[in-house]
From Swiss-Prot:
CDD domains: Adenylation_DNA_ligase_LigD_LigC (cd07906). GO terms for molecular function: ATP binding; DNA ligase (ATP) activity. The active site is at K25. PANTHER family: DNA LIGASE 1, DNA LIGASE 1/3 FAMILY MEMBER. The lineage of its organism: Bacteria, Bacillati, Bacillota, Bacilli, Bacillales. It comes from Bacillus subtilis (strain 168). This is SPbeta prophage-derived DNA ligase-like protein LigB. Belongs to the ATP-dependent DNA ligase family. One of its GO terms (biological process) is DNA recombination.
Length: 270
């Protein structure tokens, strides 16, 4: 049984509030796990069934009529989630990466929806399931302490934190202001060296000329400014190449090949 997950709103700064539960944000793949008719099934947030991709979760001992929400990760040697590794595991049956299902919510119990119950009650239900499994980790969270948790995320080079209203219901298929995320962004100076003709993705490079990947996210006003500044050097069937323009971008770490992950425009350096 698939349940469309509750999604997060993004905010820029963490805060302390005892009316919220704070959790570390794990960089992985959102996964809904359900057990009905004594069959465990796994779904991505977009309702793609991926049960066969994670066979190690098939023996999880949970009552029939249960639906869990969580994130599948692969932990790197230092313990931090490795997004590239979990995607490699997701895409290839030959991958030997061990996964961990980090469970943070329960939506159905005994075949009945408990989505309307407050988060604190759902956390109690989650703990009562006693999910004792080598590939499962229950995220309990802590009351308040948003600032301290965000500093910990930065110290450990984690993706960020999630701050959830303690009395919030589980809002199925909705991006809610009751659940907030604060991303631990990195900031890097790069050059825009061109853009794609079809969907206007910007080509980025580092000052030494090596590729930094593509950037999709730039506010409309800044796109207008970009097009007024650009000086076209040459074109191909797919790309327009320009004289390099220096800018700052924010992003979620770098890939093993040095590319920026999900870069977005921050400011001009001209």
């Amino acid at each position: 049984m698939f349940v469309s997950p509750m999604l997060l709103h993004s905010i820029k700064e963490p805060f302390n509030d005892e009316n919220y539960i704070t959790e570390l944000k794990f960089d992985g793949i959102r996964l809904i796990l359900s057990k009905f008719d004594n069959q465990i099934k796994l779904y991505t947030r977009h309702n793609n069934e991926v049960t066969s991709k994670f066979p190690e979760l098939m023996d999880l001992d949970i009552p029939d009529g249960t639906v869990l929400d969580g994130e599948v990760i692969v932990a790197a040697s230092g313990g931090a989630p490795d997004f590239e590794a979990v995607m490699e595991r997701f895409m290839s049956k030959k991958s030997a990466h061990n996964i961990v299902y980090c469970v943070f919510d329960v939506i159905y119990k005994d075949g009945q929806s408990i989505a309307a119950k407050p988060l604190t009650e759902r956390k109690t239900v989650l703990n009562s399931l006693e999910l004792d499994h080598p590939n499962v980790f229950v995220i309990e969270g802590t009351q308040g302490n948003g600032l301290a948790y965000f500093n910990l995320a930065k110290e450990k080079n984690l993706e960020g934190i999630v701050i959830k209203k303690a009395n919030s219901p589980y809002e199925i298929n909705k991006r809610s202001h009751n659940w907030l995320k604060v991303i631990n962004y990195d900031y890097t100076e790069v050059l825009i060296t061109g853009y794609t003709k079809k969907d206007i993705k910007f080509l980025l490079s580092y000052p030494d000329g090596t590729s930094a990947g593509f950037m999709e996210f730039m506010p409309h006003a800044e796109r207008t400014k970009f097009h007024s500044m650009k000086q076209v050097k040459s074109e191909s069937d797919e790309y327009v190449f320009i004289e390099p323009i220096l800018c700052n971008v924010k992003h979620r770490f770098k890939t093993k090949h040095g590319k920026l992950r999900i870069p977005s425009f921050e400011s001009w350096r001209v």
